[in-house]
């Protein structure tokens, strides 16, 4: 007897729920002991964005004091990071203050984890479904994107590893930025590889850019794809509106703080009393945050430098020779972006997405160094790793390739588990 369409639909939904539940369980079981979500804590005392949210509630932009990377400009202290986390904290603190005046401005940990980290498995799963993976394989690739990349140790900086590097890392804003950006990048992929509503890709761009500024370069494939839609004018309008909003809020904040919409204030971290000022000082005595001279060294670290493998009384251990290690060693799956280059090049959407990662990578390579928080990995690879995985997804599903991908996954999980104790 052939089941009715309604019965088949119910069965598919039940299977989908079970697969997602297993994906979340796998992430919790694998990452939980080192990431320790229950220890995630954020408040104005340990995070610049949370302190700025408190300042917004008081009707000001200035912070009460310097903590972490903050800008000292005209005798005032400002947050210099993109605004997404500030907006999230501002909404939460405003709501809790309205409901219970006098309540401490501390994010309720389960809700904090739910907003920052919980969307990633679901959205990554949908991104790989749109990329061409079947129901089960999309869950495998989503697990790889979380446990088989440096997203694992980066998230660990907020929980288990925080105690190893000082309490100031318990809400290390750089880690939170990378994690939030994954949500935005996944939404971009879901839309551009799916129905191409364009406004949804624009929303993903906003989330990613308000977390990591370099992700704004993904507006290029969004606008290019909108230009090539059958209803070009409508698609461009739907894409341009969120792109404009993405620019407007950070630009307005920059203008209000520093008098220039293009001035993020990062250079003002390095005032004369900052011991790291020498890192960014040029021959002219001025602060230079970007430079072509940084490219060779950073490129070597991102793509060539091997990890250090050694044994202790606890067994095999892996770490970096220096602060960074090339992405191929921890995530060998990315080698397929080179092996399958001709294949993804023939797909116009995948091609333009992959091409957009080139300026994203290059801007990161031009950034001054050293790159903190990257022992055994290079955290800037998170700005494009999800794009690369989506680009090669259709060619990971063959009988031979599946076993190769599973072997890569096993190695990657072992690798990032091994370095998870290294801040």
Predicted regions and their residues:
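Membrane-proximal envelope and lipid/glycan-remodeling enzymes
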Residues: 1-423
């Amino acid at each position: 007897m052939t089941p009715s369409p309604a019965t088949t639909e119910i069965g598919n939904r039940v299977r989908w729920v079970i697969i997602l539940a297993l994906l979340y369980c796998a992430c919790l079981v694998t990452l939980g002991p080192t990431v320790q979500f229950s220890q995630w804590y954020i408040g104005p005392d340990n995070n610049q964005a949370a302190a700025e949210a408190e300042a917004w509630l008081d009707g000001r932009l200035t912070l009460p004091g310097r903590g972490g990377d903050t800008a000292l400009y005209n005798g005032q202290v400002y947050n210099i990071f993109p605004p997404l986390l500030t907006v999230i904290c501002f909404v939460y603190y405003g709501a809790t203050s309205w409901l219970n005046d006098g309540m401490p401005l501390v994010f309720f940990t389960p809700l904090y984890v739910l907003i920052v980290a919980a969307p990633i498995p679901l959205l990554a799963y949908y991104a790989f479904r749109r990329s061409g993976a079947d129901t089960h394989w999309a869950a495998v690739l989503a697990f790889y994107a979380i446990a088989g990349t440096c997203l694992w140790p980066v998230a660990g900086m907020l929980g288990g590893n925080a105690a190893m590097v000082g309490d100031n890392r318990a809400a290390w804003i750089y880690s939170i930025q990378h994690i939030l950006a994954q949500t935005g990048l996944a939404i971009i992929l879901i839309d551009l590889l799916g129905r191409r509503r364009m406004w949804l890709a624009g929303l993903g761009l906003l989330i990613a850019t308000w977390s990591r500024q370099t992700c704004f370069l993904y507006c290029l494939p969004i606008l290019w794809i909108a230009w090539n839609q059958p209803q070009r004018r409508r698609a461009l309008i739907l894409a341009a509106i969120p792109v404009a909003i993405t620019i407007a809020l950070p630009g307005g904040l920059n203008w209000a703080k520093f008098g220039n919409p293009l001035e993020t204030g990062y250079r003002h971290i390095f005032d004369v009393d900052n011991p790291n000022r020498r890192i960014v000082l040029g021959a002219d005595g001025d602060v230079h945050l970007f430079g072509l001279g940084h490219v060779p060294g950073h490129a070597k670290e991102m793509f060539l430098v091997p990890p250090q493998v050694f044994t202790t009384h606890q067994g095999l251990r892996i770490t970096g020779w220096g602060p960074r290690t090339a992405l191929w060693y921890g995530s060998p799956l990315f080698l397929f972006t080179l092996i399958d280059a001709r294949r993804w090049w023939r797909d116009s959407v995948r091609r333009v997405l992959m091409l957009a990662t080139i300026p994203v990578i290059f801007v990161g390579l031009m950034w001054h160094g050293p790159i903190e928080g990257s022992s055994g990995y290079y955290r800037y690879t998170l700005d494009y790793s999800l794009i690369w995985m989506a680009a090669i997804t259709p060619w990971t599903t063959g009988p031979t390739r599946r076993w190769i991908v599973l072997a890569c996954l096993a190695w990657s999980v072992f690798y990032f588990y091994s370095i998870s104790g290294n801040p």
